[in-house]
Regions:
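Phosphate/nucleotide-binding beta-alpha loop and adjacent structural elements of enzyme active sites
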Residues: 1-200
């Protein structure tokens, strides 16, 4: 049974969308696994249903940083945050040590290395800026976990929860990710397209 989290979500056209259909699986997993003490790095916030679910659960509402690279949904994300009375921090851009370009494919927007104008941020700078120590990651980001594996592998030593979609396997080596998670004491509790790992 999914814990009840009430929210109102609008898309980039100002239309109310059914969060029990759109992005439903992600926020349902959040509702089950995120704990009040978590300090959350969210990769791929989009309209914010998982963002809002996280923020309703955690004790310190400001200890959440939600990343979204697609400028088409930034205004909707900001509005949904406000309407649902949340306090998570929105970063309009991506975490990367390299320049990125964006590819828009409806819900499957993703980034890759290349000349582009997406603002990029350093992971450790974000931790310092918002005075957080991330111990949970929620990722619906079309393969962007590759960036963490390749450039910030140390992050996996401090997390105790990872929720992610296994999308864009051409971009992200998920077998490598599984090995990194196991080496850092995380075990799989849900597997498939949506995956959940927790610290043992």
């Amino acid at each position: 049974m999914v814990p009840e989290i009430n929210m109102v979500i609008k898309n980039e056209y100002g239309q109310v969308i059914d969060h029990n259909i759109v992005e439903a699986h992600e926020w349902h997993l959040v509702a089950h696994y995120v704990k009040p003490h978590h300090q959350i790095l969210e990769l791929g916030a989009r309209y914010g249903s998982a963002s809002i679910a996280c923020n309703k659960i955690i004790n310190d509402k400001t200890k959440q940083v939600s990343i979204e690279p697609d400028p088409n949904v930034w205004a909707a994300l900001e509005e949904n945050k406000m309407v649902n009375e949340c306090e998570f921090n929105i970063i309009k851009g991506a975490i990367s040590k390299n320049k990125l370009k964006i590819h828009n494919h409806a819900y499957a927007t993703y980034t890759e290395e290349g000349e582009g104008d997406i603002p990029v941020y350093d992971l450790w700078d974000l931790q310092n800026r918002f005075d957080v120590k991330f111990n949970a990651i929620v990722a619906d980001c079309e393969g962007c976990l590759a960036e963490l594996m390749n450039n910030y592998p140390e992050i996996f030593s401090q997390i105790e929860l990872l929720i992610y979609e296994m999308d864009q396997p051409a971009i992200c080596d998920y077998s490598k990710l599984t090995s990194i998670l196991a080496a850092n004491g995380l075990r799989c509790v849900e597997a498939g397209f949506h995956n959940v790992y927790v610290k043992q």
